[in-house]
């Protein structure tokens, strides 16, 4: 078998005829600037060819069902293994997917519970078990010798009727006695039963005494009783008193609770699946949640009075007056005021306003002629009103409007567990499958490791437990110990989802595979990095080849082989700058990566931090969504704030689910519902909020940077104003490739034509009419400065910038695109070919070129994903530019280069999952570095100057919030007080720092200019 992976002549995307040899069974890191061609080489060339060759080996029939891979543009590749790619894009958004189902741990748990679980009755909680006739006889013979009992066969249990035929039938079969409603009767003289009452009838099969010789007769009697009653037998011990619970013993051949008359189906693994009708909760169909109206959203601000519109759905629009009259009539009927805050209303009034009032109320109003009119009506209440209007809504807009007052709440039937009550009553060591799935992965591993089983169960569970424990161990190893198995897959971050798939791959135990990974360290705190690296090394040691596209310094330093692609991005990249060991990379003068790793280049620390103004800040009060523990957090305005903390500590919940969603709802009129919190102060100080993420800027090849940023509209107008266009009567629409008129109709403005090949991959060929130009001949005859519209779309942005420098509207857009480091991207480059980092910078550029009010909040979630040290340096310049205009930038980040340049840091923690959700430290990076309990502070200490930390170390007050909060968890009042005082100390000290630094700040700004 070849010991090298040989690539020759790779020309995919911007690769310039790349040839390289890579060692097999090694950890290889591909690095380089964003857009330099790393993914083109790793994913679109090496992985695509490995996958394609495997698929080619299948029959043509099987191939048509598999996603076909295009043959990459490469001369040849040798030494390829079957390839598995683990990227971030293919995360499941299915609401039925959970961490347990993705990792298959839940499948093994279902098997475990189906085979060794102990069923209980969901009503009375008694254990249920099935017994064979022999087992029943053996149990009876264990009782004290001489105990007298009768064997009864229960034929009727609590059913109405006279049962005349049944008594006659029993007599003909030779039975002489029966027990009716607890009274023994002779069948020769049956009682007359009342037809309308419920009766219980048991026929007496035999009367016996416990002794060794009675075994044969007892077995026959029990078998007869079981046969008559469909698998049930009752033993009545006549010597015991009537009220003794041991007097009657019921046995069953099936899973059946005789006390509640519930019978159970045979337990199978599918009974525990919430994706199967056999196990799913019938009310929520296994989703676990339902949309319910939330009173908190109907009255978002309890300080408002009813006259000021406290009840939000009734406070605006043309129905405002109508509801005002209704509320006034209710106030008269119940005797409460409408001009005091909603919070001060009596409980009875609140209940009636929200949930309705049964008795009719008298409503008075004046019609348009000034006459007074009176009518009576029931008062519906805001909650039932929203529910009714939501269910009756005919348009999406109307439905969305009322969904804004609803929250997803756990299904009341299954309490969010997704399963039937019968299934939840099956336990292993007193825990149901839902309770095991709700544990964190580390707790679940501990629980399964400590299982105490009898010999039979141990034998059955042995292999299942081995599989589950291995999988759980791998999940812990990749730093996901804080996740629970029932966590919905849609709520995972890209990095978490990728590491879950990584753990699943290790669990599969394959050898000789080529794994291609895309930045597995995303979303991982420096503290957990070593665990991930150990996992990658273990995968390699099993005999696999790993190609990791990565910018993380620790991972690059551990690699056996490093490939640096560059030297620039886009047109300026696509070459192999370095392929070899770390030592050679550090000495390579041409490699940007080498210069940053060796310390020749670095991202500088700002000389001075922007001061924080205590009077201008956004404060979230009482944040308690997911794992947040009722915390108050302030974000100063007009500075760059970094929110840090280990994975799962609650950063995204705080910033995205609560702060951003609240601001989007208040300022942008969005309909989404923020996470649970008491209130947000300071939102009147900002007028817009923008969320810049790494999702694609468009999902169709027709979307491109020119159309996304809006610069294409100006370009089309410019072309329409040329003399030639005016002579021909062309309008700006003529120069669009999306509408009929100017576009080439043969390819509908795509420039390529798709030819379907059934079981071969679809082939895209350039359109033979326009030859890929997208426009018809007449449109292309219009020129500006000698270039057609197609030539302009094909220009790199830096070239277009000089071309259009005389046109301010266009130049402004292009300058911002160039400032964020996208000069190499072509104006008309399809959005689908842009990397995540590039898409994010296109969004940033389109925001940057808007006229700034200086009151905008920008929220960025891990903006350094996919960015090289050099790209991060450019990004920080852009973000500083936004802040210098007076805006506020809040970033969720693990990258220390970004954290060290921030003006303010909010560090969440101390751990992930249930161990997080508190603010461990807040202050400048120097202040956070001085906090011993902060994991982020520990790593900041290593990169900040020691004297800067010692100067700032005096501010330690806010750190106590986390410690105090856990101690004072029972006393809420105490809790809020702590936070307030700590904030005050921080504020005073920050103000003091501000005074000292103000003059110095001016000089740094001047130097910059």
From Swiss-Prot:
Residues 956-1009 are annotated as: Disordered. The UvrABC repair system catalyzes the recognition and processing of DNA lesions. UvrA is an ATPase and a DNA-binding protein. A damage recognition complex composed of 2 UvrA and 2 UvrB subunits scans DNA for abnormalities. When the presence of a lesion has been verified by UvrB, the UvrA molecules dissociate. Gene3D superfamilies: ABC transporter ATPase domain-like, ABC transporter ATPase like domain, ATP-grasp fold, A domain, P-loop containing nucleotide triphosphate hydrolases. Belongs to the ABC transporter superfamily. UvrA family. This is UvrABC system protein A. ATP binds at residues 32-39, 645-652. Residues 998-1009 have a biased composition (Basic residues). GO terms for cellular component: cytoplasm; excinuclease repair complex. Residues 964-997 have a biased composition (Low complexity). Pfam families: ABC_tran (PF00005), UvrA_DNA-bind (PF17755), UvrA_inter (PF17760). A zinc finger (C4-type) spans 744-770. Residues 314-592, 612-941 form the ABC transporter domain. PANTHER family: UVRABC SYSTEM PROTEIN A. One of its GO terms (molecular function) is ATP hydrolysis activity. InterPro entries: ABC_transporter-like_ATP-bd, ABC_transporter-like_CS, ATP_grasp_subdomain_1, P-loop_NTPase, UvrA, UvrA_DNA-bd, UvrA_inter. The gene is uvrA. PROSITE patterns: ABC_TRANSPORTER_1 (PS00211), ABC_TRANSPORTER_2 (PS50893). Forms a heterotetramer with UvrB during the search for lesions.
């Amino acid at each position: 078998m070849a010991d090298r992976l040989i690539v020759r002549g790779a020309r995919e995307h911007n690769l310039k005829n790349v040839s390289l040899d890579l060692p097999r069974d090694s950890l290889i890191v591909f690095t380089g600037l964003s857009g330099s061609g790393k993914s083109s080489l790793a994913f679109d060339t090496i992985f695509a060819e490995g996958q394609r060759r495997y698929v080619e080996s299948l029959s043509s029939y099987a191939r048509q069902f598999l996603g076909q891979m295009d043959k990459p543009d490469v001369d040849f590749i040798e030494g390829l293994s079957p390839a598995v790619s683990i990227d971030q894009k293919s995360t499941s958004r299915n609401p039925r997917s959970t961490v347990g189902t993705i990792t298959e741990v839940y499948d093994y748990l279902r098997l475990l519970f189906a085979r060794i679980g102990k069923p209980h009755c969901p009503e009375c909680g008694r254990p249920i078990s099935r017994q064979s006739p022999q087992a029943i006889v053996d149990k009876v013979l264990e009782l004290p010798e001489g105990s007298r009992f009768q064997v009864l066969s229960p034929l009727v249990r609590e059913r109405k009727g006279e049962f005349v035929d049944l008594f006659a039938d029993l007599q003909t079969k030779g039975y002489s006695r029966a027990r009716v409603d607890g009274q023994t009767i002779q069948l020769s003289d049956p009682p007359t039963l009342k037809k309308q009452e419920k009766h219980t009838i048991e026929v007496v099969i035999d009367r016996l005494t416990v002794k060794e010789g009675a075994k044969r007769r007892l077995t026959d009697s029990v078998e007869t009783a079981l046969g008559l009653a469909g698998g049930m037998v009752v033993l009545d011990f006549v010597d015991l008193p009537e009220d003794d619970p041991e007097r009657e013993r019921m046995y069953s051949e099936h899973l059946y609770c005789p006390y509640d008359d519930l019978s159970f189906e045979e337990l199978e693994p599918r009974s525990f699946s919430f994706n199967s009708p056999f196990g799913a909760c019938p009310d929520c169909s296994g989703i676990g949640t339902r949309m319910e109206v939330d009173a908190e959203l109907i009255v978002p601000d309890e300080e408002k009075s009813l006259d000021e519109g406290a009840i939000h759905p009734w406070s605006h629009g043309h129905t405002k007056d109508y509801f005002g009259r209704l509320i006034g009539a209710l106030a008269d009927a119940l005797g409460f005021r409408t001009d005091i805050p909603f919070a001060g209303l009596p409980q009875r009034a609140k209940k009636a306003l929200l949930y309705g009032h049964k008795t009719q109320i008298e409503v008075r109003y004046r019609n348009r002629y000034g006459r007074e009119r009176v009518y009576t009506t029931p008062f519906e209440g805001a909650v039932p009103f929203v529910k009714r209007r939501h269910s009756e809504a005919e348009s999406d807009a109307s439905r969305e409007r009322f969904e804004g007052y609803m929250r997803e709440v756990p299904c009341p039937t299954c309490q969010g567990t997704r399963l039937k009550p019968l299934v939840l009553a099956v336990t292993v060591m007193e825990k149901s499958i839902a309770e095991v799935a709700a544990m964190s992965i580390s707790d679940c591993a501990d629980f399964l490791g400590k299982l105490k089983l009898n010999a039979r169960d141990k034998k059955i569970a042995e292999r299942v437990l081995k599989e589950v424990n291995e999988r759980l161990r791998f999940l812990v190893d990749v730093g996901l110990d804080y996740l629970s198995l029932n966590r919905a897959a849609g709520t995972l971050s890209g990095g978490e989802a990728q590491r879950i798939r990584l753990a699943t791959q290790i669990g599969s135990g394959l050898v000789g595979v080529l794994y291609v990974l895309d930045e597995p360290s995303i979303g991982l705190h420096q503290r957990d990095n070593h665990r991930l690296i150990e996992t990658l090394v273990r995968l390699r040691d099993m005999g696999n080849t790993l190609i990791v596209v990565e910018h993380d310094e620790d991972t690059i330093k551990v690699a056996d082989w490093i490939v640096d692609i560059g030297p620039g991005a886009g047109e300026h990249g696509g070459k192999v700058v370095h392929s070899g060991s770390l030592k050679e990379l550090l000495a390579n003068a041409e490699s940007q990566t080498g210069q940053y790793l060796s310390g020749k280049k670095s991202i500088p620390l700002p000389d001075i931090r922007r001061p924080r103004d205590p009077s201008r800040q956004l404060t979230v009060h009482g944040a308690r969504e997911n794992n947040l523990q009722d915390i108050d957090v302030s974000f100063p305005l007009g500075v760059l704030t970094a929110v840090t903390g280990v994975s799962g500590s609650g950063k995204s919940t705080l910033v995205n689910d609560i702060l951003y969603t609240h601001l989007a709802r208040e300022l942008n009129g969005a309909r989404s519902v923020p996470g649970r919190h008491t209130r947000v102060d300071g939102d009147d100080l900002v007028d817009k909020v923008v969320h810049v993420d790494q999702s694609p800027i468009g999902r169709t090849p027709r979307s491109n940077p020119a159309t996304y940023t809006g610069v294409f509209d100006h370009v089309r107008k410019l072309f329409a104003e040329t003399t030639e266009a005016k002579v021909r009567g062309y309008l700006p629409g003529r120069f669009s490739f999306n509408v009929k008129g100017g576009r080439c109709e043969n390819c509908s403005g795509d420039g390529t034509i798709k030819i379907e090949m059934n079981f071969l991959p679809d082939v895209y060929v350039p359109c033979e009419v326009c030859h890929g130009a997208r426009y018809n001949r007449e449109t292309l005859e219009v020129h500006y400065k000698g270039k057609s519209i197609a030539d302009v779309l094909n220009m790199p942005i830096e070239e277009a910038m000089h071309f259009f420098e005389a046109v301010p509207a266009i130049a402004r857009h292009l300058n911002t695109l160039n400032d964020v480091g996208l000069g190499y991207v072509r104006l008309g480059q399809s959005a689908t070919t842009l990397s995540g980092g590039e898409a994010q910078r296109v969004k940033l550029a389109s925001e940057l070129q808007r006229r700034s009010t200086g009151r905008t909040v920008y929220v960025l979630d891990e903006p350094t994903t996919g960015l090289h040290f050099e790209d991060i340096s450019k990004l920080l310049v852009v973000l500083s530019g936004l802040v210098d205009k007076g805006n506020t930038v809040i970033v969720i980040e693990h990258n220390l280069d970004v954290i060290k340049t921030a003006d303010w840091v909010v560090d969440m923690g101390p751990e992930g999952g249930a161990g997080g959700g508190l603010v461990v430290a807040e202050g400048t990076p120097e202040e956070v570095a001085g906090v011993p309990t902060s994991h982020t502070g520990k790593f900041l200490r290593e990169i900040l100057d020691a004297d800067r930390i010692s100067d700032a170390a005096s501010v330690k007050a806010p750190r106590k919030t986390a410690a105090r909060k856990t101690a004072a968890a029972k006393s809420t009042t105490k809790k809020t007080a702590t936070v307030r005082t700590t904030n005050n100390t921080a504020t005073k000290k920050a103000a003091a720092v501000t005074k000292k630094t103000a003059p110095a700040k001016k000089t740094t700004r001047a130097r910059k200019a």
